[in-house]
């Protein structure tokens, strides 16, 4: 485990998925946009988690972020941790399942579930997650030294 390299790797993954989500939005591929936005947000959160330990192989990260934020002196970053946790909860496991499998109980395919508005919202959340993760990564080590 190399926290610095793991963090950089996850942030690059987040940027790549975010770029694909942006392209999907331009091409009106709503389901694909939400799917890539979910992965961008997930990897942004995993980049933050990687700073302090192993990255869990799960899609639900809000609990890990919450635990991490309680164990470290954060001062000005606590709002960022809260916001990132909320985003990963909204774009978590359920959204991941819906983009890949749809809603089996209602017999709705992923292409029937997602529209322009849901793609726009997911993309906005993914952008925020990526920006927040970058800010935490930039500022947190300095916070730790105090």
What is the meaning of each model-derived region?
Residues 1-146:
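Terminal alpha-helical segments
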């Amino acid at each position: 485990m190399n926290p610095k390299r793991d963090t950089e790797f996850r942030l690059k993954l987040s940027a790549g998925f975010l770029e694909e989500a942006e392209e999907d939005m331009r091409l009106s591929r709503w389901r694909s946009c939400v799917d890539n936005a979910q992965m961008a947000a997930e990897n942004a959160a995993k980049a933050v988690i990687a700073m302090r330990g192993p990255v869990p192989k799960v899609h639900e990260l809000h609990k890990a972020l919450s635990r991490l934020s309680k164990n470290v002196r954060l001062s000005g970053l606590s709002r960022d941790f809260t916001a990132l946790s909320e985003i990963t909860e909204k774009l978590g496991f359920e959204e991941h399942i819906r983009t890949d499998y749809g809603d089996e109980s209602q017999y709705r395919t992923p292409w029937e579930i997602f529209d322009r508005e849901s793609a726009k919202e997911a993309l906005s959340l993914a952008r925020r997650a990526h920006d927040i993760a970058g800010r935490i990564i930039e500022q947190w080590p300095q916070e730790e030294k105090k």
